[in-house]
């Protein structure tokens, strides 16, 4: 909470960062409804809001495929990365600050990704998705692996971020730094949003702090900074972030959500600037041709 020391209170400036550091998410994403629902023991129990831009496919690959993929990865070296992670990169050499890149030693995505990319075509949300870069990340509790809340670059990388979660479950924690507010609506017992102004008996009534007039519970506005949304990723699940989940909400993973070794395979597509009709269309074509040869080694 706030220390009352105005101008110096971190909580006033970075509530979403502090929530992240404490490892507590106060909403959980529901794939069946597309809603972020207030967690039972939070002040937001019984409230929810639409959380667009997350697409989840459970059991995207089989156990045998998972085992084979990780075995092939482990034949190559894992390079130390930040926050206790290790990585293998398959992509062009990029300086994001200076917005410069060169194909350099990029030899394409690895051969084992050909089948993964082919399977993606069955997902309507991945129509036309052409991965130009792959990053494998290795997390273990022994190294205290985590990843701070961040946005992926959008100068080079396009709208859809695609990740395959291997070896163990985890939780993607979504946080927002914007000055916006989020409109929460009370939920019915079935977990659906109640229409505005409807008669409702929900846990939201008990947690709103105000008596609803004659049982009518108005929507509730909360600062975006006070909201963090947990997106549960089962083992072997594929997750796609796009739209608001890509550009408005940062994603990160708490240390406490790495219980066993976890390997994440992230694929990225080109931005409009490097695609057909874009300023760097020719360079984009060259990179895609290399990527989709599927003959790559880690760079």
Task: Name the predicted role of every residue range.
Residues 1-299:
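Non-heme Fe(II) oxygenase metal-center motifs and adjacent flexible, charged/small-residue loops
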């Amino acid at each position: 909470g706030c220390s009352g020391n105005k101008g110096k209170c971190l909580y006033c400036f970075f509530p979403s960062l502090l929530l992240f550091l404490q490892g507590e998410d106060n909403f959980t994403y529901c794939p069946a409804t597309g809603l972020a629902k207030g967690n039972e023991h939070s002040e937001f129990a019984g409230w929810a809001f639409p959380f667009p831009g997350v697409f989840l496919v459970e059991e995207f690959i089989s156990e045998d495929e998972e085992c084979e993929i990780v075995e092939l990865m482990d034949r190559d070296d894992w390079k130390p990365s930040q926050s206790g992670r290790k990585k293998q990169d398959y992509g062009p050499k990029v300086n994001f600050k200076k917005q410069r890149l060169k194909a350099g030693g990029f030899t394409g995505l690895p051969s084992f990704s050909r089948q993964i990319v082919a399977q993606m075509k069955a997902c309507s949300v991945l129509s036309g998705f052409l991965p130009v870069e792959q990053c494998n990340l290795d997390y273990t509790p022994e190294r205290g692996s985590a990843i701070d809340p961040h946005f992926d670059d959008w100068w080079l990388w396009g709208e859809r971020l695609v990740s395959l979660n291997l070896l163990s479950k985890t939780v993607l924690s979504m946080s927002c730094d914007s000055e916006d507010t989020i409109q929460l609506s009370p939920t019915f017992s079935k977990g659906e949003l109640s229409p505005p102004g409807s008669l409702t008996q929900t846990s939201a009534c008990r947690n709103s702090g105000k008596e609803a007039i004659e049982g009518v519970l108005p929507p509730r506005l909360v600062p975006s900074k006070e909201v963090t949304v947990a997106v549960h990723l089962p083992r072997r699940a594929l997750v796609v972030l796009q739209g608001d989940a890509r550009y408005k909400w940062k994603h990160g993973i708490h240390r406490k959500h790495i219980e066993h070794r976890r390997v994440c395979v992230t694929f990225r597509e080109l931005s409009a600037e490097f695609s057909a009709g874009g300023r760097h269309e020719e360079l984009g074509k060259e990179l895609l041709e290399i990527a989709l040869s599927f003959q790559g080694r880690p760079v």
